[in-house]
UniProtKB/Swiss-Prot annotation:
Disruption phenotype: Not essential for aerobic growth in vitro, has a 20% decrease in tmRNA levels. Increased sensitivity to antibiotics that inhibit translation (chloramphenicol and erythromycin) but not transcription (rifampicin). No change in sensitivity to pyrazinamide (PZA). Unlike smpB, the gene for tmRNA (ssr, 10Sa RNA) is essential. Strains with ssr or smpB disruptions are not more sensitive to pyrazinamide, suggesting the prodrug does not directly target either of these components of trans-translation.
Superkingdom of the source species: Bacteria
Protein localization: Cytoplasm
GO cellular component, one term: cytosol
Alphabetized NCBIfam families for the sequence: PRK05422.1, smpB
Protein name: SsrA-binding protein
PANTHER family on file: SSRA-BINDING PROTEIN, TMRNA-BINDING COMPONENT OF TRANS-TRANSLATION TAGGING COMPLEX
Organism expressing this protein natively: Mycobacterium tuberculosis (strain ATCC 25618 / H37Rv)
Main location as per UniProt: cytoplasm
Function: Required for rescue of stalled ribosomes mediated by trans-translation. Binds to transfer-messenger RNA (tmRNA), required for stable association of tmRNA with ribosomes. tmRNA and SmpB together mimic tRNA shape, replacing the anticodon stem-loop with SmpB. tmRNA is encoded by the ssrA gene; the 2 termini fold to resemble tRNA(Ala) and it encodes a 'tag peptide', a short internal open reading frame. During trans-translation Ala-aminoacylated tmRNA acts like a tRNA, entering the A-site of stalled ribosomes, displacing the stalled mRNA.
Length: 160
């Protein structure tokens, strides 16, 4: 049914490259306006957020390039897999997003797509793109932290 369940959430899809390619500044939860066959396809655990992003057009937030495959039992009522989907946020949240995007060089990136209390939600991040050197620094920092933890584990076991 779903890939994992965390805190009452059934995660359908996650954008694993987003945390690698972007520095996450702030995270929002938004509802997604879907058609019936899209929900059925998501309940089967089929979706991809790779290369997807969100934009703000005329005061509305849209999820673009997210792939939800056609429902296999659907007929002529099936949806288009890569159509633009409206995200449901409060006006105040949209206004703060618009202000922050204008203020700095930020992007809206979906982190995960999940079911919460029977409704489809998307975890949307206000993020800044990382340069190659930033990615290398993060990898070096992670490797150093891993080595420290490994050494502490060895000392705790009395191996050194």
């Amino acid at each position: 049914m779903s890939k994992s369940s965390r805190g009452g959430r059934q995660i359908v899809a996650s954008n694993r490259k987003a945390r690698h390619n972007y520095s996450i500044i702030e995270v929002f939860e938004a509802g997604v306006a879907l058609q019936g066959t899209e929900v059925k396809s998501l309940r089967e655990g089929q979706a991809s957020l790779a290369d997807s992003f969100a934009t703000i057009d005329d005061g509305e937030v849209w999820l673009r390039n997210a792939h939800i495959p056609e429902y296999r039992h659907g007929s002529w009522t099936n949806h288009e897999p890569r159509r633009n989907r409206k995200l449901l946020l409060h006006r105040r949240q949209i206004d703060t997003l618009v202000g922050k995007i204008r203020e700095g060089n930020f992007a809206l990136v979906p982190l995960s797509l999940y079911f919460a209390e029977g409704k489809v939600k998307v975890e949307l991040a206000l993020a800044r793109g990382k340069q190659a050197r930033d990615k290398r620094q993060d990898m070096a920092r992670r490797d150093a932290q891993r080595e420290v933890l490994r050494e502490l584990g060895r000392r705790a076991k009395g191996m050194t």
